[in-house]
Each structure stands twice: as C-alpha cells, then as structure tokens.
C-alpha cells in the first residue's frame, strides 16, 4: 500500500487523517493501493489513474455530497423537449494551468470536442459509456465515417457545447462526469504529441481542477497542491 499527501488543500474524499501546521496549512492523507502508470484521464479506465486525475481535472458537471448534479465547467445546462439535445454553457472564469500553476488558456467549448475526438481516435477504455449514446460516434469509431464534425458534439461558440443523442437518456448528465467526456486543450495536446499524459510526469497534462499534481513517488506518495487560481478556490 502507498500513501497520498495533499498539501494546503481543502477536504479530499476518502481521507483517513489530517493535520495543520503553524502557518495554517492543512495536510490530508489517505491510503491507495496501486500506483498509476499514466495520467491519461481521456483514455484509461484504470482506477489508479482516475483517483489522481479526478482531483485535478473537471468536467462539465459534478456530484455534490447528496449525489445531485451541480455545475463545474458548465455553469448552466438545458435539454430539449425530445430529450435528444443537451446544451451546456461554460463559465467564463475557468482556466487551464500548468503543473506550476501558470495560466495557459481559457477552458472553451472546443476543448470538449477535442477531448472526445482524442478519446475516440485512441479507442478509450471509456468509449463504451458513450459510443452508442452520441449521434454518429459509433460510426466514427468503426470507421464508417471519417469526418468527426458528423458526430453529435458541437462547440456552438467559445462557451457553449452541445451533444446530440441517438435516443433520450435520463441519466445522460451522469456521463459528463466521466473522463471520456473531459476536456483537453488542443494546442497543448498537439505540442505534447505522444508525450501527452505519458507516465506520471505532472507537466504532461494541464489542470482545470481544484488541485495541481506536484509529484508521484512510486510505492510511496502522491502530492497535490491547492490550485490558488481555481474558479471555486474558496
């Protein structure tokens, strides 16, 4: 078993202990069983990776302590009367940051389109969750169509992303919390190439969540730091 240390942070789920120092900084620790072998939240189905990236990557929605869906990257959303079209309005104060906490770019609707295309092209472990849900995605994954613009995800503008489904799914919003539908910045993705999310290098991904990953020491510790510029840092 290995431990996780979270520095200067708010509460983390499944924490087993906490402490404070003279500066008022808080440290939370919990036990995890397996080291992650990569940070690719878009493609891996491994819990070891998700346990790390769920603290540093935000999707459109998240669950509150009661299991209700609340805003995350999306500040508002709506569904068409026929239940086939879901439209999400992104908050304009959400940003991407490097592992050093430097602002990289705004989080935009195109990031969600880029994320799903990447997941489909890389045959993500999580595709089964959405492949038959999103219009045209199954055909794209199978190679029956090659133009991703025919898939039912669109960036209507910088802050509006829309999904078109094959049939109504009352549980669709739950899927927006999954890694396969998470965003990624296209410029950063292209700059990294095959090194994107490779291994456990914190600098191999960008961060739009409440914490920044600082280090992973195999069979020893994972260290996070509170993102001081996170839109909901307080």
Locate predicted features.
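Short, solvent-exposed loop/turn elements at domain surfaces
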Residues: 22, 36-43, 68-70, 96-97, ...
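Gly/Pro-rich hinge or "lid" segments in bacterial periplasmic/extracellular proteins
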Residues: 148-149, 158-159, 164-234
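N-terminal lobe/hinge region of extracytoplasmic solute-binding protein
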Residues: 31-81, 206
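C-terminal motif of bacterial Sec signal peptides marking the signal peptidase cleavage site
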Residues: 11-14
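Aromatic- and charge-enriched surface segment that lines or borders ligand/interaction sites
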Residues: 75-126
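Bacterial signal peptide processing site
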Residues: 16-18
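Sec-dependent N-terminal signal peptides
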Residues: 1-6
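Short, well-ordered beta-strand elements
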Residues: 24-34, 85-89, 112-115, 161-162, ...
């Amino acid at each position: 078993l290995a431990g996780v240390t979270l520095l200067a942070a708010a509460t983390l789920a499944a924490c087993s202990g906490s402490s404070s120092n003279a500066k008022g900084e808080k440290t939370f620790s919990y036990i995890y069983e397996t080291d992650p072998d990569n940070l690719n939240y878009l493609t891996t189905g491994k819990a070891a990776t998700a346990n790390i990236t769920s603290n540093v990557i935000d999707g459109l929605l998240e669950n509150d302590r009661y299991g209700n869906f609340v805003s995350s990257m999306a500040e508002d959303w709506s569904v068409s009367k026929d239940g086939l079209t879901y439209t999400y309005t992104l908050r304009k104060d959400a940003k991407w940051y490097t592992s050093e906490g430097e602002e990289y770019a705004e989080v935009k609707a195109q990031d969600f389109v880029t994320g799903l295309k990447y997941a489909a092209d890389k045959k993500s472990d999580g595709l089964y969750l959405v492949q038959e849900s999103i219009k045209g995605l199954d055909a794209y994954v199978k190679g029956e169509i090659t133009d991703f613009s025919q898939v039912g995800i669109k960036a209507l503008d910088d802050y509006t992303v829309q999904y078109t489904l094959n049939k109504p799914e009352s549980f669709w919003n739950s899927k927006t919390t999954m890694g396969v539908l998470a965003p990624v910045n296209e410029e950063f993705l292209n700059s990294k190439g095959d090194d994107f999310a490779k291994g456990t290098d914190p600098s191999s991904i960008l961060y739009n969540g409440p914490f920044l990953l600082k280090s992973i020491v195999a069979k020893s510790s994972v260290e996070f730091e509170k993102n001081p510029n996170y839109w909901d840092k307080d």
